[in-house]
Amino acid sequence: AKERLLADIYETAKSSVGLPVAPDSDALRMFRLVLGEGRSLIAQRNQIEDRAVALLKDLPDYQLLTSIPGIGPINALTILAEAGDLRRFGHHRQFLKFCGMDLATIQSGTFRGQTKLSKYGNARLRRTLWMAGQVAILQRTNSFRDKFERYIAKDRQNTHLRRKAYSAIAAKMARTVHGIIKHGEPYRPFFEG
């Protein structure tokens, strides 16, 4: 949405008259209109987000999710909205499959393709967990960043290895989310159990 707004502003500016522009020109009126529309949409989005946070802040699952590094209010709301009750998944592998983060290999006869993410699950949930993982590895010290650093330690410049590391972090984020909700305990850094 922001990209579209910026693209519209850019196109308006590109087709407008160069400086100096008369204060009552059509180009300036159009620019102000687009800018006002963008500000209005941002204000509406903020109101919706604030209301959603106010409604869910007392929910125990919401509080548990926000204890995980990288998961803020919007990511927690998205996870709860897209996944529903995570306790319905008996094992974290079922939740990974629901997210589309399970590994799949294409096979036919004797041919065996590469193993990669199936991506058959919920794309919004997968994207949210991916973004939460990105934020978590940017924070100071936590198990997500530690795993990412270990993963790319062999070759820091290898983009393919980085992409695999990001996928591994997103899958770890999904497992952590499932475990925390299932057991009802807040996130504990570097706890493997």
Question: At which residue positions do the language-model features occur?
Answer:
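A detector of single, family-specific signature residues
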Residues: 1-193
